[in-house]
């Protein structure tokens, strides 16, 4: 046994290991027994076998709770977003879980390029050694089967564009972790300062708030697949087939229903829920010399 550990009693060793790992007393006792009371080796043992044990004990349980995060770069040109799931809201609402989400998001962020546009699979995330280590440590401490559900690196499509985000139901101990995360990409008709101006950032933040509340399906009409629009038209025409209305009247009705469909599903076509007088988002952004490029929405439920 290393000299530094010889002066500590078994009780003190267990207490020290519990403090550093967050594992239970019996797990710590077993780890020390397996590693000859070597604290460093016992901590590694817990990382390897403690997380595996947690996975075995909770196999088959649904990971329906959790948190999402948005780590934005200081120039507002790229960000890393993660969805991390737990079994219970008791775990997901704890400061320990929030700290884990922040740590693992930071580690994913350092493993990716700021010029990358990519969604990572769980397997790709676990292949990052420091990310896997972070997960193993958290599973020992939190004692639930945690899941790195998804991670996305979002980067502006042009240098003149900028991003901003909004977190709904923030965790008490974090400004960038919560239950819903919305990110918007906005283009400027003139060269955008880097970082964007406070006014531009506020416009982006409010638009992201709208996204979190309205949960649109598309950013622009152009993003809707032609097959989706044709299917909607077929449904509308089927609903009117027994009305004996003239074709030109039916066409007007279909166009009106399509406008309503766009207003319900397309971000640009919606009334802005956060701006005064609820202007149409496309028109409002145009009045500010801006236009919508895209949005991303992550939600636990």
What are these regions (language model features)?
Residues 2-301:
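N-terminal assembly/interaction segments in proteins that build large macromolecular machines
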């Amino acid at each position: 046994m290393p000299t530094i550990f010889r002066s500590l009693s078994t009780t003190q060793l267990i207490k020290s290991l519990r403090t550093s790992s967050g594992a239970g007393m019996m797990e710590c006792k077993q780890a020390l027994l397996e590693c000859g009371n070597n604290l460093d080796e016992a901590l590694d043992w817990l990382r390897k076998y403690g997380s595996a044990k947690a996975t075995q004990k909770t196999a088959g349980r649904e990971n329906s709770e959790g948190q999402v995060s948005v780590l934005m770069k200081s120039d507002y040109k790229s960000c890393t977003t993660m969805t991390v799931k737990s079994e219970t809201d008791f775990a997901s609402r704890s400061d320990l879980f929030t700290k884990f989400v922040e740590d693992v998001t930071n580690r994913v962020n350092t493993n990716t390029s700021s010029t990358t546009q990519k969604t990572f699979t769980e397997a790709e995330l676990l292949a990052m050694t420091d990310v896997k280590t972070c997960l193993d440590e958290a599973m020992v401490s939190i004692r639930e089967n945690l899941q790195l559900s998804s991670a996305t690196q979002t980067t502006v499509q042009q240098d003149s564009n900028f991003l901003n985000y909004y977190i709904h139901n923030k965790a008490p101990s974090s400004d960038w972790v919560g239950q819903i995360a919305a990110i918007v990409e906005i283009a400027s008709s003139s060269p955008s300062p880097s970082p964007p101006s406070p006014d531009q950032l506020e416009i982006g933040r409010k638009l992201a708030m709208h996204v979190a509340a309205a949960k649109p399906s598309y950013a622009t009409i152009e993003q809707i697949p032609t097959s989706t629009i044709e299917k909607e038209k077929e449904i509308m025409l089927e609903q009117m087939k027994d009305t004996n209305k003239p074709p030109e009247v039916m066409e007007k009705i279909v166009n009106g229903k399509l406008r309503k469909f766009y207003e319900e599903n397309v971000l640009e076509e919606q009334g802005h829920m956060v701006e005064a007088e609820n202007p149409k988002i496309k028109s409002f952004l145009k009045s500010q010399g801006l236009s919508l490029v895209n949005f991303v929405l992550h939600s636990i439920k």
